[in-house]
Amino acid sequence: MEMTSGLKAIADASFDSVMITSAGGKNQIVYVNKAFEKLTGYKAKDVLGKDPKFLQGAATDPATIRQLVKDLKAAKTFEGRTINYRADGSPFIMHWRVLPVKSGRGASAKVENYVAIQRVISA
């Protein structure tokens, strides 16, 4: 995803964690902001190109992840809560929203990326 300088400035200034992934079955992280780094303890250079599943663990709710996958396959926005894990292994409860980003308009629009906005509920 090619980010304009204005869009990047907004994401970089956000208090919430922002992660952008590729679509089309690759599901690779292409961007994270500083709030993501602070929340998770992972540096951007260490997560770019990875599938975000590495943030999940034993207490991550499988039903929530199934709903996420279902909504994204239908090109719908997902919103939910789950437990993810920081780089040091500590869990955190987060509320997050994942939005499909489409190229084009109408029936021919294709999902190119997903934008995940994450907010910690409990440390």
Roles of regions detected by a PLM:
Residues 77, 91-95, 113:
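Beta-strand residues that line the small-molecule/cofactor-binding core
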Residues 2-26, 31-34:
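Sensory modules in modular signal-transduction proteins
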Residues 96-98, 118:
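Sensory-domain boundary capping and coupling elements
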Residues 58-73:
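PAS/Per-ARNT-Sim sensory domains
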Residues 48-59:
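PAS-family sensory/regulatory domains
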Residues 36-47:
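PAS/PAS-like sensory domain cap-loop motif
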Residues 23, 83-89, 93, 102-105, 108-123:
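PAS-family sensory domains
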